[in-house]
Amino acid sequence: MENPVIIYVISDAIGETAQHIIRAVTAQFSLNKPADIRRHAFIRDENALLETLEEAKAADGIVVQTLVQSKLADYASNFCVKNHLQNVDLLHTLTAAVEAKTGLKSKQDPGNMRRLDSNYFDRIAAIEFAVKYDDCKDPRGLLDADIVLVGVSRTSKTPLSSYLANQNWKVANVPLVPEIPIPDELFQIPAERIIGLTTTPEKLAQIRKVRLKSIGLDEASSYSSEKRILEELEYGYATFKKLGCQVIHVEDKAIEETAALITEIITSYH
């Protein structure tokens, strides 16, 4: 097939979930051209729905719907049957199964989906925040952060910031380097929002040597020397003491495990 498969996502919310599912499915096919996914979000009445369905009909597309209200879902399904369009209703087959199993009726409230959408936008904002204030690019961001991670180089500050951002936390991080002054803003925020990250000298040396090798530099650089590492770690501990913050050892911990410890500490203060 020379022309791409055209798929219309019709949703009374954002339609992001349907789009993810479609991409997962189409990835299983050796298509000459990527599927053309056309997302129509916030379809809340029959007029808007009909306009979108007519467009899908003209393009001979596949309709994938996530319409919470059964009235609109039925309207879309009937239109597709009459016009010989392939139609996939992602919500109502499962909704019917849950209703049959529980004896309860679906609320059919798109507002519940909107609340999920709000959560989605909060997550995107948190991710953008983490990127903007990574590595203390702008110290002013420390004042607005939910969590501030502090530690010497290669103690997982950036990956932890990204992971926590995906859980809707606004995270900034500050690298500790003996020759670089600590930003004043770090002393202007409550200590309970700051987490110090550290590790063992042996583990840090190992990680830094791997890093140097990966970028084509000499593994014997002072960056990975025992003397330099001990100096930095001691500076880190002195800084943590000044800040009065909690400290986590990250050696031999997965990012998920360290992130769980961080959120446990942060939420314990609220």
Curated annotation (Swiss-Prot):
It catalyses: N(tele)-phospho-L-histidyl/L-threonyl-[pyruvate, phosphate dikinase] + ADP = N(tele)-phospho-L-histidyl/O-phospho-L-threonyl-[pyruvate, phosphate dikinase] + AMP + H(+); N(tele)-phospho-L-histidyl/O-phospho-L-threonyl-[pyruvate, phosphate dikinase] + phosphate + H(+) = N(tele)-phospho-L-histidyl/L-threonyl-[pyruvate, phosphate dikinase] + diphosphate. Signal peptide: none annotated. GO terms for molecular function: ADP binding; ATP binding; phosphotransferase activity, phosphate group as acceptor; protein serine/threonine kinase activity. It comes from the Bacteria. Keywords: Kinase, Nucleotide-binding, Serine/threonine-protein kinase, Transferase. ADP binds at residues 151-158. The keyword Transferase applies. Transmembrane segments: none annotated. It holds the Pfam family Kinase-PPPase. Its EC number is 2.7.11.32, 2.7.4.27. PANTHER family: PYRUVATE, PHOSPHATE DIKINASE REGULATORY PROTEIN 1, CHLOROPLASTIC (PTHR31756:SF3). NCBIfam families: PRK05339.1 (NF003742). Belongs to the pyruvate, phosphate/water dikinase regulatory protein family. PDRP subfamily. HAMAP family: PDRP. Bifunctional serine/threonine kinase and phosphorylase involved in the regulation of the pyruvate, phosphate dikinase (PPDK) by catalyzing its phosphorylation/dephosphorylation. This is Putative pyruvate, phosphate dikinase regulatory protein 2. It comes from Listeria innocua serovar 6a (strain ATCC BAA-680 / CLIP 11262).
